[in-house]
């Protein structure tokens, strides 16, 4: 997530000619988590890149994984509030997925969310996000032959329909709990 000024200069010029959105895959706001998953940067580095990109008038997006080891719901709520303070236009989020052949797959001594548990986590999370932040997606799907877990057997649109129903049941909306 290093963004040199020369590249920002180019993107700023390109942004004048066409639609452009730069997405940063930050995955987490917790530096200990970022080190554990070998991201090679701190949150401060990503925050700087986001602010400099948005400061050039470029639409800026983010991407996070919910359910990384060591990140409980309390940490994730704090993460949502932290992200709400950044000049992000869009946010993509998805569940942690264990993929065959990865280091994390060999460890697998941590909690993975069941679908209904994850739906409630997503609702808690988005209640702490700015209302104007465009949420692009809530889940990701890996190829079945590579996926160890979780296998919820849902397409993205099916998950989103369940999420919407649960939000209505809970009288929840984006930004409801943001301080």
Task: Name these PLM-found stretches.
Residues 13-17, 42-45, 81, 110-112, ...:
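Short, low-complexity, polar/charged sequence segments that are solvent-exposed and flexible
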Residues 34, 38, 69, 106-111:
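Short helix/strand-bridging catalytic loops that position acidic/His residues to coordinate divalent metals
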Residues 28, 32-34, 61-64, 105:
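N-terminal small/glycine-rich loop or linker at the start of catalytic domains
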Residues 1-50, 54-55:
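Conserved SAM/AdoMet-binding glycine-rich loop
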Residues 7, 34-36, 72-74, 146-148:
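A short acidic (Asp/Glu
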Residues 44-103, 116-141:
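Conserved C-terminal portion of the radical SAM core fold
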Residues 90, 98-179:
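Auxiliary Fe-S-binding modules of radical SAM enzymes
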Residues 1-5, 69, 140-145:
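Short, internal active-site loops enriched in acidic
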């Amino acid at each position: 997530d290093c963004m040199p000024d020369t590249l920002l200069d180019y993107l700023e010029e390109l942004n004048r000619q066409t639609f452009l959105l730069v997405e940063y895959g930050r995955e987490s706001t917790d530096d200990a988590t970022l080190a554990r998953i070998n991201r090679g940067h701190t949150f401060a580095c990503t925050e700087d890149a986001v602010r400099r990109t948005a400061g050039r008038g470029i639409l800026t997006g983010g991407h996070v994984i919910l359910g990384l080891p060591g990140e409980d719901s309390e940490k994730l709520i704090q993460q949502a509030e932290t992200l709400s303070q950044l000049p992000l236009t869009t946010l993509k989020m998805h569940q942690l997925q264990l993929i065959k052949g990865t280091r994390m797959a060999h460890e697998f001594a941590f909690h993975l969310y069941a679908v209904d548990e994850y739906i409630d986590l997503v609702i808690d999370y988005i209640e702490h996000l700015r209302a104007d932040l465009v949420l692009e997606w809530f889940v990701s799907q890996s190829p079945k032959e590579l996926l160890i877990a979780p296998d919820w057997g849902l397409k993205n649109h099916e998950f989103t329909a369940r999420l919407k129903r649960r939000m209505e049941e809970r009288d929840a909306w984006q930004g409801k709990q943001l301080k």
